[in-house]
């Protein structure tokens, strides 16, 4: 049961969290480059 339930939680988590972290890190990198 847990094996079939895990992808339904893991896939949206990766699909939402990973792009958010990538966009945040890219935004901070651009801001840091503009300031300096």
Curated annotation (Swiss-Prot):
Record key words, sorted: Chloroplast, Membrane, Photosynthesis, Photosystem I, Plastid, Thylakoid, Transmembrane, Transmembrane helix
GO annotation terms (biological process): photosynthesis
Main location: plastid
TM region(s), chain numbering: 9-29
Family, per entry: Belongs to the PsaI family.
Function: May help in the organization of the PsaL subunit.
Protein's name in the database: Photosystem I reaction center subunit VIII
Lineage: Eukaryota, Viridiplantae, Chlorophyta, Mamiellophyceae, Mamiellales
Gene that encodes the chain: psaI
């Amino acid at each position: 049961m847990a094996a079939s339930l895990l992808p339904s939680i893991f896939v949206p988590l990766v699909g939402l969290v990973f792009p958010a972290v990538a966009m945040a890190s890219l935004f901070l990198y651009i801001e840091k480059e503009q300031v300096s």
